[in-house]
């Protein structure tokens, strides 16, 4: 088939236009992909910022804002750090932090159409709630005596002069709770639970078997190993400082169940009932006792309503 010159010209023009359109759509697809990637990265950044900010609510709103801004800056959108201002952090209520982030994304090929950049946004809300069940508990249960923050507390009694201790109960307990499996007894398991914490979850209302005896040797071994994991950390009167771990995550911050001091194990009684959960910075031995400092801790676990000093944070938007 032969084409006239004008037909050949028309085909050439059509082919050129088609190629330009295809290239334009391909270019736009690249920019759209860039925008979608940026949106996902920004959302991840504001999520992390909200969670970090909600942890700061344990102290006050100023700390929440500081942590939120700091965490945002540790994230990037298309290799650029996320900039968050204090005016982008708000508080829907006393336990929630809302983050409204935005970021300007430079485009590549859309500049041909006169579009040089787009502004994307992301919103996240996180709340600080009460944890009523968690794992990682140490094998001690102590009487709830209503300590103020920073108070020294006996975590493991060394003799019967401690509150509600007796010749067969020095605050030592076995895991798992009754009804969740057979409680595992013995010195080596008890020692390992001091070092690493329980693998099972302990919740308010659980009934826990008492480990009889003073367990002097296993206690000393376990406490020594645990302190050795973060030996430089210490309590400065307000918080844990000089830790080798990020804030609030030293292994020496231990979680312990509480029981009613008026409902303690008398000689012959083999269980305690968990009425609350709390956390302490492990100091070490003081005389025959093992001591800690009462403090609040953010941890993972089951959220709910109950008598617990453990806090958790989660996204709700």
Regions found by a protein language model. Name each.
Residues 9, 31, 72, 99, ...:
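Residue-level signature of catalytic and energy-coupling elements of molecular machines
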Residues 88-95, 116-317:
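N-linked glycosylation sequons
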Residues 36, 40, 50-108, 130:
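Short amphipathic secondary-structure patches
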Residues 108-116:
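Flexible, membrane-facing loop/turn or short amphipathic-helix motifs
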Residues 1-70:
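Alpha-helical assembly-interface signal, strongest on the long, hydrophobic N-terminal helix that forms
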Residues 21, 106, 137-139:
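Proline-rich low-complexity regions
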């Amino acid at each position: 088939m032969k084409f006239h010159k004008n037909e050949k010209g028309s085909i050439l023009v059509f082919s050129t236009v088609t190629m330009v359109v295809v290239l334009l759509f391909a270019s736009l697809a690249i920019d759209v992909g860039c925008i979608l990637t940026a949106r996902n990265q920004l959302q991840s950044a504001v999520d992390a910022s909200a969670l970090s900010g909600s942890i700061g609510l344990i102290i006050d709103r100023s700390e929440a804002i500081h942590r939120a801004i700091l965490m945002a800056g540790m994230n990037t959108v298309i290799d650029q750090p996320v900039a968050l201002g204090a005016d982008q952090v708000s508080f829907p209520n006393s336990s929630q932090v809302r983050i409204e982030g935005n970021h300007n994304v430079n485009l590549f090929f859309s500049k041909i159409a006169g579009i040089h950049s787009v502004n994307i946004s992301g919103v996240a809300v996180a709340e600080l709630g009460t944890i009523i069940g968690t794992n990682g508990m140490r094998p001690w249960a102590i009487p709830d005596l209503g300590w103020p923050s920073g108070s020294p507390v006996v975590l493991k009694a060394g003799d019967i002069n401690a509150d509600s201790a007796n010749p067969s109960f020095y605050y030592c307990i076995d895991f798992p709770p009754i009804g969740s499996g057979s409680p595992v007894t013995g010195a080596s398991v008890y020692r390992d639970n001091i070092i690493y914490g329980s693998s099972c979850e302990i919740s308010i209302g659980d009934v826990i078997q008492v480990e009889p005896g003073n367990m002097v040797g296993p206690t000393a071994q376990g406490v020594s190993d645990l302190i050795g994991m973060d030996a430089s950390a210490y309590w400065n009167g307000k918080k844990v400082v000089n830790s080798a771990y990020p804030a609030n995550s030293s292994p020496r911050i231990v979680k312990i169940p509480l029981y009613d001091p008026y409902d303690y194990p008398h000689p012959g009684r083999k269980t305690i009932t968990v009425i609350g959960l709390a956390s302490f910075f492990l100091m070490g031995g003081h005389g025959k006792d093992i001591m800690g400092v009462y403090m609040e801790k953010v941890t993972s676990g089951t959220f709910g309503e109950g008598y617990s000093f453990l806090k958790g944070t989660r996204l709700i938007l």
